[in-house]
């Protein structure tokens, strides 16, 4: 492990609180396998609408409302906001490494359910270690590159004497390395990893600490229209071995040995590439409304049955809302909630043309179109015309808030 080089970061990372919540939502959109029928999983990010702001130094910081003393809330806040800040930083780093690519985030557990058992027979031993997320950097006509990501967070405060962080961040980074080692793609130790620990009460504001393990994994190139492309439905491979599955070669005087882990073998790389692309497509459709458009991309063990049912706006996420920004139409789902006395409408969705492609099962065509449209996202000036915070991502997704007019009920 080593610190992330300044060249990989490219200076400071400019973020708004709403972009962080957009990242939280995208990270959790498939995490519950669609079982949160009353409220789509990605709306959990909304409870942090008043938790972040810019401080006097221009850095992101917790608001007074975000600095709660409740231990259970702090634990949840550290876990979930760490996903937002960690993924935002990780995506930024991966974009710097592959500047002409689009990056997609997929929950690792959702991927692994297609072929592996996530827990052992002895339940007291807990779940098997693995990274939290996979970031796929992709460009039509080129092999995809995969990076493991582990996100952790804490509320530790820097030492008043030295300003240095205490042991919690170091422990989280070390634990992140252990989790990342629990999965291998192709040859041992070839997949790059990013371990991130977010200090929500760091010196001067929110601080994201990052370590990396170098490497590069390239998945086999898929040819649109040819066998093995991402439009083709795939089956899960349940029963892929976990015990002694990872082969560690002889090194530094130690003999070669096998250890437990999630191993994607050389012969499974093409299948894994399809699985990654299709699960990513499931996440996009779930973000825009879920339902059967999501189910088509998941295997049985990934939770397909939870989406393969009729959807109704009152009981689940439904793709029946739309907005227009900068001359572009976005379709998706919405949710109304309150912040004190103000009624707020949250919208999550996708560019209408891109959603049309992906809802019809055209993953490869979606990727070509998204790549061509990535530079045409609404500008900052166009975004300011929206009546509230709004965040766009190059994969075509959008998340926005708007204040609803006061609604008065007539007396009965």
Residue ranges of predicted features:
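Nuclease-adjacent, charged terminal/linker segments that flank catalytic cores
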Residues: 1-57, 282, 286-412
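Long, hydrophobic/aromatic-enriched structural stretches that serve as scaffold segments
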Residues: 51-63, 84, 92
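Glycine-rich, often proline-containing surface loops adjacent to acidic residues and nearby aromatics
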Residues: 61-70, 144-152
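Acidic-basic catalytic patches of nuclease active cores, encompassing PD-(D/E)XK
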Residues: 68-119, 180-192, 284-285
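Acidic, metal/cofactor-coordinating or nucleic-acid-engaging core segments within structured domains
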Residues: 95-98, 157-360
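Extended hydrophobic secondary-structure segments that form protein cores and membrane-embedded regions
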Residues: 105-112, 147-151, 193-201
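Active-site metal-binding core of divalent-cation-utilizing nuclease and nuclease-like domains
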Residues: 108-141
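Conserved catalytic cores of phosphodiester-cleaving nucleases, focusing on short active-site segments
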Residues: 132-137, 141-158
């Amino acid at each position: 492990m080593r610190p992330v080089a300044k060249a990989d970061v490219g200076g400071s990372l400019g973020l708004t609180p709403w972009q962080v919540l957009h990242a939280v939502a995208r990270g959790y959109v498939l995490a519950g396998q669609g079982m949160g029928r009353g409220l789509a999983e990605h709306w959990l990010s909304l409870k942090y609408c008043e938790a972040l702001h810019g401080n006097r130094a221009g850095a992101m910081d917790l608001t007074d409302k975000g600095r709660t003393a409740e231990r259970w809330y702090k634990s949840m806040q550290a876990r979930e906001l760490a996903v937002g800040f960690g993924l935002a930083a990780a995506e930024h780093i991966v974009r710097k490494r592959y500047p002409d690519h689009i990056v997609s985030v997929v929950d690792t557990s959702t991927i692994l359910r297609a072929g592996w058992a996530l827990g052992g027979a002895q339940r007291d031993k807990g779940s098997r270690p693995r990274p939290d997320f996979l970031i796929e950097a992709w460009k039509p006509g080129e092999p995809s590159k995969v990076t493991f990501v582990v996100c952790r967070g804490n509320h530790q405060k820097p030492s008043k004497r030295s300003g240095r962080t205490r042991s919690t961040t170091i422990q989280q980074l070390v634990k992140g390395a252990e989790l990342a080692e629990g999965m291998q793609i192709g040859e041992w130790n070839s997949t790059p990893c990013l371990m991130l620990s977010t200090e929500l009460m760091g010196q001067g504001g929110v601080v994201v600490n990052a370590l990396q393990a170098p490497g590069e994994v390239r998945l086999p190139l898929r040819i649109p229209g040819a066998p093995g492309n991402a439009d083709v439905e795939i089956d899960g491979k349940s029963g892929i071995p976990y015990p002694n599955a990872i082969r560690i070669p002889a090194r530094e005087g130690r003999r070669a040995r096998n250890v437990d882990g999630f191993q994607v073998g050389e012969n499974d790389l093409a299948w894994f590439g399809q699985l990654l692309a299709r699960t990513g497509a499931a996440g996009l459709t779930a973000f825009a409304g879920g339902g059967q458009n999501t189910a088509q991309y998941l295997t049985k063990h990934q939770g397909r049955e939870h989406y393969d049912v009729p959807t109704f706006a009152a009981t689940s996420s439904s793709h029946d809302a739309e907005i227009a920004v900068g001359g572009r139409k976005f379709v998706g789902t919405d949710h109304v909630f309150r912040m004190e006395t103000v009624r707020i409408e949250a919208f999550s969705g996708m560019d209408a043309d891109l959603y049309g492609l992906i809802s019809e099962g055209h993953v490869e065509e979606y990727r070509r179109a998204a790549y061509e449209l990535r530079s045409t996202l609404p500008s900052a000036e166009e975004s300011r015309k929206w009546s509230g915070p709004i965040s766009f991502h190059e994969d075509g997704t959008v998340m926005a808030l708007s204040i609803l007019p006061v609604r008065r009920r007539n007396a009965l």
